Amino acid sequence: MKLAYWMYAGPAHIGTLRVASSFKNVHAIMHAPLGDDYFNVMRSMLERERDFTPVTASIVDRHVLARGSQEKVVETITRKDKEEQPDLILLTPTCTSSILQEDLQNFVNRAATESKSDVILADVNHYRVNELQAADRTLEQIVRFYIEKAKTQNDLATIKTEKPSVNIIGIFTLGFHNHHDCRELKRLLTDLGISINEVIPEGGSIKNLKNLPKAWFNLIPYREVGLMTAKYLEKELNMPFVATTPMGVIDTAICIREIEAILNFTNQSKIDKEPYNFEDYIDQQTRFVSQAAWFSRSIDCQNLTGKKAIVFGDSTHAASMTKILAREMGIRISCAGTYCKHDADWFREQVSGFCDSVLITDDHTKVGDMIARVEPAAIFGTQMERHVGKRLDIPCGVISAPVHIQNFPLGYRPFLGYEGTNQIADLVYNSFTLGMEDHLLEIFGGHDTKQVITKSLSTDSNLTWTIEGLAELNKIPGFVRAKIKRNTEKFARENNISEITIETMYAAKEAVGA
């Protein structure tokens, strides 16, 4: 456990609650002290939904510590069972309440005898896993529970649908543009003649989990959540899955070809059927629907060729974005990174050959220092990299959770599929400062009234600029001023100069060979 004012992935119970609150008619009970129960506020603030967050906190206070938790937890479960009448009640501790080492499974067993709802305990080690790993595990646990329940009741729907169908697994609340991606995936799959069997957990009913085996295959758009469920269904029910994220023109085509291979394999028993071939669709979409392929050959995109960028985010979005920028737009990726340390090997394999260096860390200060050191033309990252970019005057496009309210847009903004390629192209182009715009504003917009502000990430600087030095700095065009200021301050620190004059600026210029 560590104290931080910013975490890329939250504690495990947040992931469990995200999955539980994504399903319809599932109620989560959080056994936690005050302070751990911020999920309701966070979800209500960020998600553009009208329903209440179905999470109740069973508060651990001094009375509970004195008498034990069993009575209160069981009473909360049975009360919510009567009030809400959910299909499932999911009990989860937090990392704080786990310290008490209580037998919560025993509480669940007792409450289950008094409740009409199913009651389960989230099987997550709160000290070993983060939010995303816990979400993946909880989704798999819920699916496993209902598949096994359907098996014992001989109620499992194992007969495949007549026409190709798919389960989309991993769309859930507070995800990065997940609702928009889901709509785009449905449109893409419908174009291919594939019907949607189930979408879980977002908007899914646990009563329908027994119907998962009816689909021909499972689609996992994000590695972070859904992969464990897909592997379980493959092992138990022999269901194939596609885990290639259809992000960018090239990977979308790869994903469609993988789907084509699965459909032809599943369909091979039907002798009279023509094999599925989606090459014409890929060609049509790439050339005429997606503007990204055309844009990447335009003079606008060629202006970006060779520019330096940094990418950081969850493993799915960071890896995909790195490949799109390098392969499809010719942008040089100085560093690609992810905070998903548990997925480091896969990430390194994906970005190998597309970037100069790889950074695997969940420490935002290391990411900030790396950005300050590299001084890229643009950053593509999370909300935190957006903050860093503002402090360093480097533009940033947000491409991954965690994000704030700006990235829960009301308009349609998918990142997956062919429409997603258009959104990404817009984001990339608009993130780079256009050539001379800053300079032209200064020339034609009157004299520059902007005060020079500190662009270094360290706030303990004791450097001072003389009036003459600042006046000279203000004469420098805005689009290179920040870089020159940083280089001058770096030179001053290295040479123990506390007051920066015009002479210091010229000495720094000579030192860097400019």
Swiss-Prot record:
Pfam families: Oxidored_nitro, PCP_red. Pathway: Porphyrin-containing compound metabolism; chlorophyll biosynthesis (light-independent). Keywords: 4Fe-4S, ATP-binding, Chlorophyll biosynthesis, Chloroplast, Iron, Iron-sulfur, Metal-binding, Nucleotide-binding, Oxidoreductase, Photosynthesis, Plastid. Its EC number is 1.3.7.7. Its main location: plastid. It catalyses: chlorophyllide a + oxidized 2[4Fe-4S]-[ferredoxin] + 2 ADP + 2 phosphate = protochlorophyllide a + reduced 2[4Fe-4S]-[ferredoxin] + 2 ATP + 2 H2O. Substrate binds at residues 435-436. [4Fe-4S] cluster binds at residue 36. Binds 1 [4Fe-4S] cluster per heterodimer. The cluster is bound at the heterodimer interface by residues from both subunits. One of its GO terms (molecular function) is oxidoreductase activity, acting on the CH-CH group of donors, iron-sulfur protein as acceptor. GO terms for cellular component: chloroplast. One of its GO terms (biological process) is light-independent chlorophyll biosynthetic process. The active site is at residue 300. Its cofactor is [4Fe-4S] cluster. It is found in: Plastid, Chloroplast. PANTHER family: LIGHT-INDEPENDENT PROTOCHLOROPHYLLIDE REDUCTASE SUBUNIT B. Belongs to the ChlB/BchB/BchZ family. Component of the dark-operative protochlorophyllide reductase (DPOR) that uses Mg-ATP and reduced ferredoxin to reduce ring D of protochlorophyllide (Pchlide) to form chlorophyllide a (Chlide). This reaction is light-independent. The NB-protein (ChlN-ChlB) is the catalytic component of the complex. Protochlorophyllide reductase is composed of three subunits; ChlL, ChlN and ChlB. Forms a heterotetramer of two ChlB and two ChlN subunits. This is Light-independent protochlorophyllide reductase subunit B. It comes from Pleurastrum terricola (Filamentous green alga). The gene is chlB.
